[in-house]
């Protein structure tokens, strides 16, 4: 429950910024003045990324100081661990990479405001389908830095350390189910608000923009078939990768097992992995982002968001699945993508459930 509350609190300022950005665009498109609301939008944006940049810079400075002062490192370690030996052992690997962690936080955070400049967005508009005058599009492209921060955080701490920390936490199945649904519902609602629901679009218009429709029997069949096909593609990828010496990363397997392994032991857990991720991620990525960011960039973001895989074979697999889902979105609609994504996850989950020795 505590983790879910924290997730909601972290999403709250992001909801506020996209809501204000949509209000600014609404006034602009209606011929009114949007400078005040746009200015307020960008001010909140600067506060969010400014705090991140300051925290990252502080961590970076502390890391530099600790390299020249052993006593400072020990004092900082004692402060964080509370004097416990086990906690100290868990924190020490993080402290060893504190400089990279700080840099990975402040550098993307400092870069994010650059996308608020119309001149920068004019150049981006040559590559992706955005309107450089739009406050919504300005916020959307700048929020890509959140994905970068998420990835650099994973790489800085290291998959091995994350796996160790995750294994030590041992969350209950109930809390995993609840937190996953909360996260994915927030993704879906954020996508709805981001494309103008509550401000520029009514409910039906928002669903139409996102490509969420009542699927036909043919679309359901195509979605399920695409999900099963994607499973086959990824299995072939893993076989080929292992044949050339690029197998699955042991730390990725450990981290995945600790994060979602408990869910694979029950049918409700497997259904949650399929339905929650299908609804939340597809509404955000294929529904909201792909029409503006395009197939390749959206698929890349989709892969990087799954930062628990670091940069490994699993990341490539997610990218390929993202491409398949993106092509499906271009040919059909987001609802079909939801079905395909859910079918893919549920199929993999059932394989792990029925044949645990294969994983």
Where are these regions (language model features)?
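Intrinsic disorder/low-complexity segments
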Residues: 66-71, 162-165
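Alpha-helical transmembrane segments of polytopic membrane proteins
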Residues: 2-13, 43-45, 90-109, 176-189, ...
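Juxtamembrane helix-loop-helix connectors linking adjacent transmembrane helices
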Residues: 76, 80-83, 87-95, 123-186, ...
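Transmembrane helix-loop-helix hairpins at the membrane interface
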Residues: 1-39, 50-61, 66, 75-95, ...
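Membrane-water interface of transmembrane alpha-helices
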Residues: 13-26, 102-125, 190-203
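Alpha-helical transmembrane segments and immediately adjacent membrane-interfacial amphipathic helices
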Residues: 45-61, 104-117, 146-157, 188-192
